[in-house]
């Protein structure tokens, strides 16, 4: 993307945040990804079994053993992310009394994205992936952008409660939203002002867009 590996754009968006640790999960073609990241001050951790996004984050636990604070989780296939929006999200999270903040946005065509389920007051209850959603839930236009601010202590406790009881038989990272609510926490959300900036790239067609 713009003559650079896609993940470079994500890493560069994060760099000005001065994170204590930066960890990249690798799996498919891990050697190529690791080679592309040699110029950056970060560590790579392999997800040997492709068992879902929740499992991928769980694989990073050992790398964060000595860290205590806020974990920012992003997808490596969102090359249009801007530092300014990540800073805004971090500010929203730090000013809220919550262990978890998620980024949402609204799309006219939300196909393939997890839907944000809220109560009548607009409070976030859960994220339902498209393959697990009912027909009614699929009409929801507010989607999960796949970016999270999570307090580390809550994150790994919650991930141990995630199951593979879903249509894809995987550990969904999105399940930590419902787990937070179930444990009496309010989940904050940052509504991204530019939907196109958080869209992922899963094909050459999406890349061209």
Show which residues each predicted segment covers.
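A conserved hydrophobic position in a structured secondary element of the catalytic/binding core
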Residues: 28, 81, 119, 150-151, ...
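Catalytic-core segments of class I nucleotidyltransferases/pyrophosphorylases
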Residues: 124-198, 202-209
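Rossmann-like NAD(P)H-binding beta-loop-alpha module
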Residues: 105-136
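Structural beta-sheet core signal
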Residues: 23-24, 72-73, 100-103, 189
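His/Asp/Glu-rich metal-coordinating catalytic cores
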Residues: 71, 76, 84, 103, ...
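Conserved donor-nucleotide/metal-binding helix-loop-beta segment in metal-dependent transferases, i.e.
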Residues: 84-111
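Conserved N-terminal catalytic core of the sugar/cofactor nucleotidyltransferase
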Residues: 5-91
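Short, high-confidence coil segments that cap the C-terminus of an alpha-helix
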Residues: 19, 68, 95-100, 185
């Amino acid at each position: 993307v713009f003559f650079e590996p896609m993940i470079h754009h994500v890493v560069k968006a994060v760099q000005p945040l001065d994170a204590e640790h930066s960890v990249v999960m690798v799996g498919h073609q891990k050697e190529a990804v690791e080679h592309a990241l040699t110029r950056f001050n970060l560590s790579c951790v392999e997800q040997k079994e492709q068992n879902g996004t929740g499992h991928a984050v769980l694989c990073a636990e050992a790398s964060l053993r000595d860290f205590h604070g806020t974990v920012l989780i992003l997808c490596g296939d969102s090359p249009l992310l801007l530092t300014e929006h990540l800073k805004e999200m971090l500010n929203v999270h730090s000013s809220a009394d919550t262990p978890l903040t998620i980024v949402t946005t609204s799309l006219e065509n939300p196909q393939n994205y997890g839907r944000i389920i809220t109560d009548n007051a607009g409070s976030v209850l859960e994220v339902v992936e498209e393959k697990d959603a009912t027909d009614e839930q699929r009409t929801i236009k507010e989607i999960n952008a796949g970016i999270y601010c999570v307090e580390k202590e809550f994150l790994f406790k919650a991930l141990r409660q995630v199951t593979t009881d879903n249509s894809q038989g995987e550990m969904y990272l999105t399940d930590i939203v419902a787990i937070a609510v179930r444990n009496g926490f309010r989940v904050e959300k940052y509504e991204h002002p530019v939907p196109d900036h958080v869209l992922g790239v899963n094909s050459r067609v999406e890349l061209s867009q």
